[in-house]
Each structure stands twice: as structure tokens, then as C-alpha cells.
Amino acid sequence: MVPNPPISLAQGDDLIIGGRRFHSRLFTGTGKYPSMEVMQQSIKRSACEMVTVAVRRVQAVAAGHAGLMEAIDWTRIWMLPNTAGCTNAEEAVRVARLGRELAKLAGQEDNTFVKLEVIPDGRHLLPDPIGTLQAAEQLVNEGFTVLPYINADPLLAKHLEDAGCATVMPLGSPIGSGQGLNNAANIALIIENASVPVVVDAGIGVPSEAAQALEMGADAVLVNSAIALARNPAAMAEAMGQAVIAGRTAFCAGRLPRREEASASSPTTGLVSS
């Protein structure tokens, strides 16, 4: 069942997460870019308003992250600290707390957002459902606005929503794989049952897949690798931004219902006889 879309896509069709309003439904990342300058150009051309930052990499000044905090205009871009690299709930909670302090250093005193990642498997990078739920419950109790990265599991998504998460973020396919929406059927179930925004995260490789996610009724997408590893990252960022607008507009317009049989678009009455 496809969720009922808004009647029209008006100026007020903004995305609200944790009480904060976003015009853009594309979120981007900060990793894998060939240079800081390319990252800056890509963020600008994407027109995104929220960017995720790997707290552990910034804290350790990992390769490609030196100068990151100074490279982004945090008066315009909302920081989404993430717990990438954490393998269990305890680690994720500690890193989330560091992320909150990082946001404060960027001048965002009221930023409680965290993209929660608990990933014990370094090969496939699939999230741990039990650890994610445990960490989410703790972080919600501490006042965080939790955006959990999960497998496309409708039951887990509902448990996280019930725990107080501000969104759920099901993966389309494994991180960085570019395989697209391999889990479209389960994502559709999550969208149908969710009372919080659904953000498709991971696996999107091309703009058409971002558009597809929005056409399905997802509220937003998070795209990093497909932009950062493109031949022209800034151009791909712009294309992703346009695709998200197109997908959301199409969803709001309402798709043609699927039919078992053909239906002629030309009139069948009043035909000129031969």
C-alpha cells in the first residue's frame, strides 16, 4: 500500500526532524572526497542543509578530515554527528556525547542530533539491530535527537520509533556499494507504518535511485559515496539535489495506478471511419 501523499507540493512542504525544519530532503556526508575544496563545492551545489560528520575521524584528525570543522559554514549547514566506527552500544553512546560537544564547538549550542551507527562487521558494514536499539534507548533518555541507521527491518523500525527516535534510516543496500534500493519492498513497509520521517541511507548510486526513494514516499535520502566518488562530485551533488526534488514532487503529484491491461490514451469514440 502506497501512503497517501500531500495534496500539493507547496512552499510549506518542509521536512521537520526533532522540531527543526529543512527545505532540502537531501543530506550529504563529508568522507571520501578527493579534497576539501571539492567537498565544499559539492555541498554548495547539492543545496543540502544537513551534513553528517564522523565524530571519531574528526577527533583523531583522520586523513581527509583535517580542517573539516573550518571548511563548512555551520551557520548555514546543520551538523549531523555520526557514530561511525562504533562496534557496540556503549561505544556509540560515548561517541554521541562527543558529537554533541563537537556541534557546540561549531556554534550549534542546541544541536542534539546524532546519526546512530553500531556496526560490528567491518566487511559488510551492516548495522547491529540489538546494539542499535540499546544505544537508541539510552541516547533518547539523555535528550538526544536520534537518527538510527538500520537494516530495512520494519519491526526494528517500529521498535526504534516507539523508543523515541526522531527518524528511522533504513539502508537501500550496503554502504558504498552503489547497488541501489535492493530492499525496496521492506522500505515501502517501513514507510507505510512509520509515524516519523523515513530517511533512506546507504547504497544509492545514481540520482534516479534517490528519486525512486522519494517517489516511494521516503522523506529524505542521505548520499555520500555516490557524490564523493563520482568523476565530477560537484556535478553529481547537483544532480542528486535535483533528483530529490523531482522524486518528492512526483510523490506529491500521485503516480498513475498500475493496471493489468492497457488503457488507450486516445479517445475510442467519434473515430473517422475508413
Swiss-Prot record:
The lineage of its organism: Bacteria, Bacillati, Cyanobacteriota, Cyanophyceae, Synechococcales. Coiled coil: none annotated. SUPFAM superfamilies: ThiG-like. It catalyses: [ThiS sulfur-carrier protein]-C-terminal-Gly-aminoethanethioate + 2-iminoacetate + 1-deoxy-D-xylulose 5-phosphate = [ThiS sulfur-carrier protein]-C-terminal Gly-Gly + 2-[(2R,5Z)-2-carboxy-4-methylthiazol-5(2H)-ylidene]ethyl phosphate + 2 H2O + H(+). HAMAP family: ThiG (MF_00443). It comes from Parasynechococcus marenigrum (strain WH8102). Pathway: Cofactor biosynthesis; thiamine diphosphate biosynthesis. This is Thiazole synthase. Pfam families: ThiG (PF05690).
